[in-house]
Amino acid sequence: MKTKVGFNRLDRKSSHRKALLRNMVISLFRHEKITSTKAKLSEVKRFAEKLITRAKVDSVHNRREVSKFIHDKYILNKLFTRISPIFKERKGGYTRVIKLGQRYGDAAEMAILELVDKTLEEKQ
C-alpha cells in the first residue's frame, strides 16, 4: 500500500500549509522572485503555474477561481493585466527554480523561484 503519495506536506497541518503556500505565491507575483528552501519552492511552483495558466484567459469565472486562492486585489489585478499577457504564447513552464546550495545554519537546500521571462519593469 502506497502512503503519502501526491504532494509534499512540508511537515505542517493543512491550514498552515495552505496559508504558507498562498503567502509565498502572492510574494512571487508581487516581487517576481523569492528565495526559500527547495522543497517549499517546488510546491509553490505547482500553484503558481496553475494560476498563471488560469489567468491567461481573462474572464469573470477565471477571476473568481483565482481569487479563491489570491485574496489580495492588487496582486490579482497584476496577475491578470501584467503577468499573464507576457505568457500568452507559452504553453507552460512560466517559472524556474535556481539552486543556491545549502543554508549555513541547518544545511537546508536553498533555491530561488522566479518568473521565466524578463522582469515586468524591463518589458514596460
Curated annotation (Swiss-Prot):
SUPFAM superfamilies: Prokaryotic ribosomal protein L17
Entry protein name: Large ribosomal subunit protein bL17
HAMAP family linked to this entry: Ribosomal_bL17 (MF_01368)
Gene: rplQ
Entry's family note: Belongs to the bacterial ribosomal protein bL17 family.
InterPro entries, per database record: Ribosomal_bL17, Ribosomal_bL17_sf
UniProt GO BP: translation
An example molecular function term from Gene Ontology annotations: structural constituent of ribosome
Record-linked Gene3D superfamilies: Ribosomal protein L17
Lineage, uppermost ranks: Bacteria, Pseudomonadati, Spirochaetota, Spirochaetia, Spirochaetales
Superkingdom, taxonomy of origin: Bacteria
Example of a GO cellular component annotation carried by this entry: cytosolic large ribosomal subunit
Assembly description: Part of the 50S ribosomal subunit. Contacts protein L32.
Protein keywords: Ribonucleoprotein, Ribosomal protein
Native organism: Borrelia turicatae (strain 91E135)
